[in-house]
């Protein structure tokens, strides 16, 4: 843990500006792009399959986000996922809305089988992915899925599928955030309730992880960094603002500012049940 914290402190500033290919939903597209820019990366937001052959030769990592799914978006995600598997491109799959429709479930499972580096979602989405029940409606997580016993069940279920998803890092976000890889797990507990009140915070976590994968960071460390960085940024933003729109803007502002001082990482809260 101590060595990982030292590594997390040293990640920013990035030593190079990686090119990050994002196939994401158009609702949060600008937020995702700005998150990558503020970290020091360069986003390219392309879902046109005609460009993939060229882009896969020049980009450093790939973000696949299932939000606002339609037939064209599904085709882009599916093709990019297969290409990423063939080319061993570092990839984050964000299972937005997994399990709420057959289309999302089939697509999410297909992308998961293509050996992504990281699979993420909120606790309810990841519960459905491993076959556990969830009371969540739509793309928002259910509070009942975030109780201690529910998280214990989720961690156990994720560890049980590691033979099928060897080395893949699973990230489940919520009031407590869970990271699982093979037989190890971690629970983080920073953050504020206001993060659930504006669209795109989960997408931002995916963007941060992908940016760090693009500069060669270890996916386990990158996932810890991404969750903690956003949550600590939100804690700082809440202390400086009143009103949700001001809070939303300040979170993005803190994505830019927070990493200029390595001491932000001393605020990371590791948790048990």
Curated annotation (Swiss-Prot):
SUPFAM superfamilies per UniProt: Ribokinase-like (SSF53613)
- List all membrane-crossing ranges: none
Q: Does the keyword Glycoprotein apply?
A: no
Query: Top EC class per UniProt?
Result: transferase
One Pfam family per UniProt: HK
- Which chemical reaction does it catalyze? 5-(2-hydroxyethyl)-4-methylthiazole + ATP = 4-methyl-5-(2-phosphooxyethyl)-thiazole + ADP + H(+)
Pathway of action? Cofactor biosynthesis; thiamine diphosphate biosynthesis; 4-methyl-5-(2-phosphoethyl)-thiazole from 5-(2-hydroxyethyl)-4-methylthiazole: step 1/1
Give the GO biological process terms.
Answer: thiamine biosynthetic process; thiamine diphosphate biosynthetic process
Q: Which InterPro entries match?
A: Hyethyz_kinase, Ribokinase-like
Instruction: Tell me its cofactors.
Output: Mg(2+)
Keywords of this entry: ATP-binding, Kinase, Magnesium, Metal-binding, Nucleotide-binding, Thiamine biosynthesis, Transferase
Q: Which GO terms describe its molecular function?
A: ATP binding; hydroxyethylthiazole kinase activity; magnesium ion binding
Query: Where do the annotations place substrate binding?
Result: 45, 200
Sites where the protein binds ATP: 120, 173
Enzyme Commission designation: 2.7.1.50
Functionally, this protein is described as follows: Catalyzes the phosphorylation of the hydroxyl group of 4-methyl-5-beta-hydroxyethylthiazole (THZ).
Family in the record: Belongs to the Thz kinase family.
Protein name (record): Hydroxyethylthiazole kinase 2
Q: Whose protein is this, by species? A: Leuconostoc mesenteroides subsp. mesenteroides (strain ATCC 8293 / DSM 20343 / BCRC 11652 / CCM 1803 / JCM 6124 / NCDO 523 / NBRC 100496 / NCIMB 8023 / NCTC 12954 / NRRL B-1118 / 37Y)
Q: Point out the gene that encodes the protein.
A: thiM2
